[in-house]
Every structure is written in structure tokens, then in C-alpha cells.
Curated annotation (Swiss-Prot):
Part of the ABC transporter complex LolCDE involved in the translocation of mature outer membrane-directed lipoproteins, from the inner membrane to the periplasmic chaperone, LolA. Responsible for the formation of the LolA-lipoprotein complex in an ATP-dependent manner. InterPro entries: AAA+_ATPase (IPR003593), ABC_transporter-like_ATP-bd (IPR003439), ABC_transporter-like_CS (IPR017871), MacB-like_ATP-bd (IPR017911), P-loop_NTPase (IPR027417). Residues 8-236 form the ABC transporter domain. GO terms for biological process: transmembrane transport. The complex is composed of two ATP-binding proteins (LolD) and two transmembrane proteins (LolC and LolE). It comes from Leptospira interrogans serogroup Icterohaemorrhagiae serovar Lai (strain 56601). It is a peripheral membrane protein. This is Lipoprotein-releasing system ATP-binding protein LolD. Gene3D superfamilies: P-loop containing nucleotide triphosphate hydrolases. GO terms for cellular component: plasma membrane. Keywords: ATP-binding, Cell inner membrane, Cell membrane, Membrane, Nucleotide-binding, Translocase, Transport.
Length: 237
């Protein structure tokens, strides 16, 4: 599938809950093929920003354009089609359907698009790539946490999306499975040029990405300012 070469553009994005402004005028650009991490302490607004950029939560104000399209000006049918064809999502919890097998879960996006047969072999290929060939027909409750998360990643990739949005994808995993997931995402970006935006509190994970965006109290800050703030917090302790 051919996509417009334009990436993600965020302008003066704000999010308010009650009287509290959580995201404070964020402006940023993410180029096609980039691999970007959103870092910052808990409560800094990382996940909120990711959800807005990925069309899952509307901003209070500001604009988000993906491939030159203002995603919050689309109607429900348009945004559903846009997500299904161009976006893949990975979360801390896998949200797989326990009554279905690994391969059936991977194929859910294709089933929704009416393209089950067209993507069957590719779904099998992904599970083989993720060392799950002998687990394809296992139900989710027979898989380990790391195996289930790999199934979730395969599900996110099965429609060949241009963009992957991942919210703490290793947050519930042990160190061994964390490295597996990190390596998978790095390989996907390198080999397919899929644009990846990932939220992580893990500095080792962030260091594997091509670029880090640092959030402090809902604002994007420079690396120098980010390090200075971290240092001042440690000193205060």
C-alpha cells in the first residue's frame, strides 16, 4: 500500500481535565521512518500525548496531522478506516481475546477489514518470526506474558501499518522479554521503515530509539533541561 510521504505534525497541542492542563502547547514533527520515544516521569503526560497523536483521545485544542490529514476533522467512518489501514497499536497489557488462538488474535484487524484470507500467510509468517510457530493454535491463557505480548505486536503489524503507537509495551515484562520486544521493534523500524512512537520510562529502551522527546509537566523540553530537572530532583531527595 502506498502512503503520502509526510509523517506526523503536531501544533500547539493542549489537553485539559477539569481545571488542570495536562498537555501544555506541545508542537513537534515526526518524519516518515522515524523511531521516537516519549520519556519522562510518571504523570508527565506521555501516555496522554500518545493517545491524542494516535487519534484515540481528542485534544482540548491544537492540531494533529498525519499524512497531511487533520485526524480530528475526519468523521467516524473515515477515522476508523484510517486507523485500520495505517496504524497499529501496542499497549502495556496485550488486550488479546482469550477465547481465540494466537493466530486468530493476530488476524483480528484483517477480519474486520474483510481481508482474512489475504493476510493469513503473513500472520503466520509474523508468528514464526517472533518464535511462536509452535504456539499459533494455542489460546492466550496457555502463553506466557512475553509470548502474549509478541502476539499483540504481530497483531499490530499484520496490516502493514505505516505507524505503530506503543504505550509502555514492556512495562509488564521481565528483563528477558523486555529485550525481546525492544529488539523486535528496532528490527521492524530498520527493515520496514515503519514509523514508531513509543512511550517508555525505561532509559535503556529509550536509548534504542533514533530520537527521544522528553516531557516534563506536560511540556516538551530539551535534553539539557530534562537532565537538569532530573538532577535537581535527586539533589532535593
Amino acid at each position: 500500500m502506498q502512503f503520502v510521504n509526510s509523517g506526523i505534525s503536531v501544533t500547539d497541542l493542549r489537553k485539559t481535565f477539569g481545571n488542570s492542563e495536562i498537555i501544555k502547547g506541545v508542537t513537534l514533527d515526526i518524519e516518515d521512518g522515524d523511531y521516537v520515544s516519549l520519556t519522562g516521569k510518571s504523570g508527565s503526560g506521555k501516555s496522554t500525548l500518545l493517545y491524542m497523536i494516535s487519534s484515540l483521545d481528542p485534544p482540548s485544542s491544537g492540531t494533529i496531522k498525519i499524512d497531511k490529514k487533520d485526524i480530528y476533522r475526519m468523521n467516524e467512518e473515515e477515522i476508523h478506516e484510517f486507523r485500520n489501514k495505517r496504524m497499529g497499536f501496542i499497549f502495556q497489557f496485550h488486550y488479546l481475546l482469550p477465547e481465540f488462538t494466537a493466530i486468530e488474535n493476530v488476524l483480528m484487524p484483517a477480519r474486520k477489514a474483510g481481508l482474512l484470507k489475504e493476510y493469513q500467510s503473513y500472520a503466520e509468517h509474523l508468528l514464526e518470526e517472533f518464535d511462536l510457530k509452535d504456539r499459533m493454535n494455542y489460546r492466550i491463557n496457555r502463553l506466557s506474558g512475553g509470548q502474549a505480548q509478541r502476539v499483540a505486536i504481530a497483531r499490530a503489524l499484520v496490516m502493514n501499518p505505516k505507524y505503530i503507537f506503543a504505550d509502555e509495551p514492556t512495562g509488564a515484562l521481565d528483563s528477558t522479554n523486555t529485550k525481546v520486544v525492544m529488539n523486535i521493534l528496532e528490527k521492524v523500524n530498520r527493515e520496514t521503515k515503519t514509523t514508531i512512537l513509543v512511550v517508555t520510562h525505561d532509559p535503556d529502551f529509550a536509548s534504542k530509539t533514533k530520537r527521544q522527546i522528553h516531557l516534563v509537566d506536560g511540556r516538551v523540553v530539551s535534553l539539557k533541561e530534562f537532565e537538569a530537572i532530573k538532577k535537581s530532583v535527586k539533589t532535593a531527595r
